[in-house]
Amino acid sequence: MKTQREKSVRRAQRNRIRLRKFANGRPRLSVYRSSKNIYAQIIDDASGKTVVAASSLEEAAQKEHGKGWDTKAAELVGKLIAERAVKEGVKDVVFDRGGYIFHGRVKALAEAAREGGLNF
Protein backbone atom coordinates (compact mmCIF):
# COMPACT_ATOMS: atom_id res chain seq x y z
CA MET A 1 0.00 0.00 0.00
CA LYS A 2 1.30 3.43 -0.88
CA THR A 3 1.96 6.01 1.77
CA GLN A 4 0.34 9.43 1.73
CA ARG A 5 3.67 11.01 0.73
CA GLU A 6 4.09 8.66 -2.25
CA LYS A 7 0.58 9.47 -3.44
CA SER A 8 1.26 13.18 -3.13
CA VAL A 9 4.50 12.94 -5.13
CA ARG A 10 2.82 10.93 -7.90
CA ARG A 11 -0.06 13.41 -8.06
CA ALA A 12 2.41 16.30 -8.40
CA GLN A 13 4.31 14.49 -11.16
CA ARG A 14 1.08 13.76 -13.03
CA ASN A 15 0.10 17.40 -12.77
CA ARG A 16 3.45 18.67 -14.10
CA ILE A 17 3.45 16.27 -17.05
CA ARG A 18 -0.03 17.46 -18.00
CA LEU A 19 1.04 21.10 -17.63
CA ARG A 20 4.01 20.65 -19.95
CA LYS A 21 1.69 19.19 -22.56
CA PHE A 22 -0.55 22.27 -22.57
CA ALA A 23 1.92 25.03 -21.65
CA ASN A 24 2.82 26.05 -25.24
CA GLY A 25 5.82 28.10 -24.13
CA ARG A 26 4.04 29.92 -21.31
CA PRO A 27 5.82 30.20 -17.97
CA ARG A 28 4.29 28.36 -15.02
CA LEU A 29 3.13 29.74 -11.71
CA SER A 30 4.36 27.14 -9.24
CA VAL A 31 2.94 27.01 -5.71
CA TYR A 32 4.48 25.39 -2.65
CA ARG A 33 2.80 25.41 0.72
CA SER A 34 4.30 24.31 3.98
CA SER A 35 2.46 24.06 7.26
CA LYS A 36 3.20 27.69 8.11
CA ASN A 37 4.04 29.53 4.87
CA ILE A 38 3.17 29.67 1.20
CA TYR A 39 5.56 30.32 -1.69
CA ALA A 40 4.93 31.12 -5.35
CA GLN A 41 7.29 31.53 -8.26
CA ILE A 42 6.93 32.00 -11.98
CA ILE A 43 9.32 29.73 -13.82
CA ASP A 44 10.28 29.93 -17.49
CA ASP A 45 10.84 26.26 -18.34
CA ALA A 46 12.40 27.10 -21.71
CA SER A 47 15.36 28.81 -20.04
CA GLY A 48 15.04 27.02 -16.70
CA LYS A 49 15.04 30.25 -14.72
CA THR A 50 12.76 31.80 -12.14
CA VAL A 51 11.29 35.05 -13.46
CA VAL A 52 9.71 36.31 -10.21
CA ALA A 53 9.00 34.90 -6.76
CA ALA A 54 7.05 35.81 -3.63
CA SER A 55 6.40 34.22 -0.26
CA SER A 56 4.67 34.88 3.02
CA LEU A 57 8.10 35.17 4.66
CA GLU A 58 9.02 38.39 2.85
CA GLU A 59 9.11 41.69 4.70
CA ALA A 60 6.52 43.20 2.35
CA ALA A 61 4.07 40.43 3.22
CA GLN A 62 4.79 40.45 6.94
CA LYS A 63 4.43 44.22 7.24
CA GLU A 64 0.94 44.13 5.81
CA HIS A 65 -0.28 40.87 7.32
CA GLY A 66 2.15 39.92 10.07
CA LYS A 67 3.24 36.36 10.58
CA GLY A 68 0.59 34.05 9.36
CA TRP A 69 -0.30 31.03 7.32
CA ASP A 70 -3.96 31.59 6.63
CA THR A 71 -5.80 32.42 3.42
CA LYS A 72 -5.21 36.15 3.93
CA ALA A 73 -1.46 35.56 3.70
CA ALA A 74 -1.99 33.47 0.56
CA GLU A 75 -4.05 36.26 -1.01
CA LEU A 76 -1.28 38.73 -0.26
CA VAL A 77 1.33 36.46 -1.88
CA GLY A 78 -0.94 36.12 -4.93
CA LYS A 79 -1.17 39.89 -5.25
CA LEU A 80 2.60 40.27 -4.84
CA ILE A 81 3.43 37.65 -7.48
CA ALA A 82 0.94 39.16 -9.95
CA GLU A 83 2.27 42.67 -9.42
CA ARG A 84 5.87 41.56 -9.95
CA ALA A 85 5.00 39.45 -12.99
CA VAL A 86 3.16 42.29 -14.71
CA LYS A 87 6.20 44.50 -14.08
CA GLU A 88 8.38 41.89 -15.81
CA GLY A 89 5.96 41.66 -18.73
CA VAL A 90 4.48 38.25 -17.92
CA LYS A 91 0.69 38.06 -18.19
CA ASP A 92 -0.13 34.55 -19.43
CA VAL A 93 0.96 31.66 -17.23
CA VAL A 94 0.07 28.05 -16.53
CA PHE A 95 -0.96 27.33 -12.92
CA ASP A 96 1.08 24.53 -11.31
CA ARG A 97 -0.63 23.66 -8.05
CA GLY A 98 2.09 21.11 -7.34
CA GLY A 99 -0.22 18.24 -6.47
CA TYR A 100 -2.07 20.25 -3.85
CA ILE A 101 -5.85 20.26 -3.98
CA PHE A 102 -7.27 23.50 -5.41
CA HIS A 103 -8.80 24.59 -2.12
CA GLY A 104 -8.05 26.91 0.76
CA ARG A 105 -4.70 28.68 0.58
CA VAL A 106 -3.88 27.48 -2.94
CA LYS A 107 -7.24 28.70 -4.24
CA ALA A 108 -6.86 32.05 -2.43
CA LEU A 109 -3.43 32.59 -4.00
CA ALA A 110 -4.73 31.71 -7.48
CA GLU A 111 -7.74 34.02 -7.26
CA ALA A 112 -5.62 36.92 -5.99
CA ALA A 113 -3.13 36.38 -8.82
CA ARG A 114 -5.98 36.46 -11.35
CA GLU A 115 -7.30 39.68 -9.85
CA GLY A 116 -3.79 41.10 -10.05
CA GLY A 117 -3.64 40.64 -13.82
CA LEU A 118 -2.37 37.11 -14.50
CA ASN A 119 -4.26 34.97 -17.01
CA PHE A 120 -4.57 31.22 -16.48
Curated annotation (Swiss-Prot):
Ranges in a coiled coil: none
CDD domains the UniProt entry points to: Ribosomal_L18_L5e (cd00432)
Origin: domain of life: Bacteria
GO CC, one annotated term: cytosolic large ribosomal subunit
GO molecular function annotation: 5S rRNA binding; structural constituent of ribosome
Record's keyword annotation contains RNA-binding: yes
GO BP terms: translation
Keywords of the record: Ribonucleoprotein, Ribosomal protein, RNA-binding, rRNA-binding
InterPro entries referenced in this protein's UniProt entry, alphabetically: Ribosomal_uL18_bac-type, Ribosomal_uL18_bac/euk
Signal sequence residues: none
Protein transport is among the record's keywords: no
Annotated function: This is one of the proteins that bind and probably mediate the attachment of the 5S RNA into the large ribosomal subunit, where it forms part of the central protuberance.
Family in the record: Belongs to the universal ribosomal protein uL18 family.
Known partners and oligomeric status: Part of the 50S ribosomal subunit; part of the 5S rRNA/L5/L18/L25 subcomplex. Contacts the 5S and 23S rRNAs.
Name recorded for this polypeptide: Large ribosomal subunit protein uL18
